[in-house]
Amino acid sequence: MSELFSRRLALLGEPANQSLLRHCLHGIERECLRVDAAGELARTPHPAALGSALTHPYITTDYSEALLEFITPAETDSAATLAALERVHRFACAKLDGEYLWSPSMPCPLPAEEDIPIARYGNSHIGRLKHVYRKGLALRYGKTMQCIAGIHYNFSLPEELWPLLQRAEGDVRGVRGVRDFQSERYIALIRNFRRYSWLLMYLFGASPALDKSFLRGRPHHLQELDAETLYLPWATSLRMSDLGYHNNAQADLTPCYNDLASYTDSLRRAVSTPYAPYAAIGTQRDGEWLQLNTNVLQIENEYYSTIRPKRVTASGERPIQALVARGVQYVEVRCLDIDPFLPLGIDLDEARFLDAFLLFCALEDSPCLAAGECASCTGNFLKVVKEGRRPGLHLQRHGQPMPLAAWAGELLERLQPLAALFDRAYGGDGYEKALHAQQAKVADPELTPSARLLATLRERGESFRAFALRQSLAHAESLRARPLGEEERQAFEAEARASLAEQAELERRDTGSFDDFVAAYQASIQGDGG
């Protein structure tokens, strides 16, 4: 344990600071495909009973019209976050007529590319911009790839923590420097996340198999489990592997996480720099928009990463602008698979473990990534998603081979005092129990969700698609068996109606042409200070 880590732990453990961790904020976004009773992709529009996907605060769509996304408010207790996620699931399940939420991350059998519906957001300029952006994604990466679903976990440390740490560490930049100190600490968290996120893939990866149709006949290195199912025997998360997808445009885009400025500069260049193959296609054909621009990235969010530094944006503000103007506010973890054994795709044990893991990443010493270390982090991550449960698997640590099981055990041991801090802050032993559940998975890989999924397929002689549909129907039944109370149901219905009215108002208020709107949106990223 580093001296710096010990000092920070001791500071948080002081009686006056013990309650601080109760002010962490936790939010969850869960994506899931809508399917029909046969487990085929729903071709119906986003249900009006769920409100407007453009303006509803808790229910939207991601890439496809059939790819729902449920969003919780930021809560000070992970248990409250999970409760909010469950409420929105119960509401949605009650409103889906003959349709179901697909339980795993990897998609159901998909129709031909041209028949996968891209999400629509109405006729306002901002609604059309979101649709054209998704058309651009189809052009660049194909629609099939965009139908993979995941869990995003948003986490922030208490605002009061930063000046406390800053003073304790002798940082004399004063009040104005707190924002920069906070951003530096979040970027340091992200560096450590890059070093250790392979552990999350081992513990929570839940996509070792997929439906054969997903690969569309492309060459691959997967094995056949049955006539409909492909898999890798030791894989944890095929979702986070390359699966044969290579996007050359993003290959050279490796934002440096050594400071916020280099990260935002790297993204700004990517959203401003033309990429020849995209330029050859152009933005419009016969007056129809094909993509927002021909740059490496159309917008910042197109960059695929396992974790992002975030700041809540004002209306009309872009993510880079918000980060440059006000610094990092929270992180968004983006590498989590949906657990198909759980109705919500995530449970409280996982959320609590993530809290402790992210606090560890924030407090642990985090030097800048040395030459070659980035490649080593990526290598470890890819190794674990493809063969994380292989007996005797070694990863690279400081240029030396290290057994995964030993390193994982060591990391979990170091999380013990952080789990204890959270339990002291909240009362009870929920965090310690969550940690023990993960230690059991390291001791016995058969307890991991990836191993459990493959064991279930083998024991039942079941294909991936049959298993996934069975789980989807079972989860729908359990959620529908506990309908919302009348008051909660009415509140959700009112929210849905209000969102539809808000979308209509946006459409009514729009002025000028869509072309001018896109041009102004593009221009907003150029020449920002920072």
Curated annotation (Swiss-Prot):
Alphabetized GO MF terms: ATP binding; glutamate-cysteine ligase activity; metal ion binding
Enzyme class: ligase
An individual GO BP term: glutathione biosynthetic process
Catalytic reaction list: L-cysteine + L-glutamate + ATP = gamma-L-glutamyl-L-cysteine + ADP + phosphate + H(+)
Protein keywords: ATP-binding, Glutathione biosynthesis, Ligase, Nucleotide-binding
Cysteine pairings via disulfide bonds: none
EC number: 6.3.2.2
DNA damage in keyword set: no
InterPro entries: Gln_synth/guanido_kin_cat_dom, Glu_cys_ligase, Glut_cys_ligase
GO CC, alphabetical: cytosol
Family: Belongs to the glutamate--cysteine ligase type 1 family. Type 1 subfamily.
Domain of life: Bacteria
Pathway: Sulfur metabolism; glutathione biosynthesis; glutathione from L-cysteine and L-glutamate: step 1/2
Pfam families: Glu_cys_ligase
Protein name as annotated: Glutamate--cysteine ligase
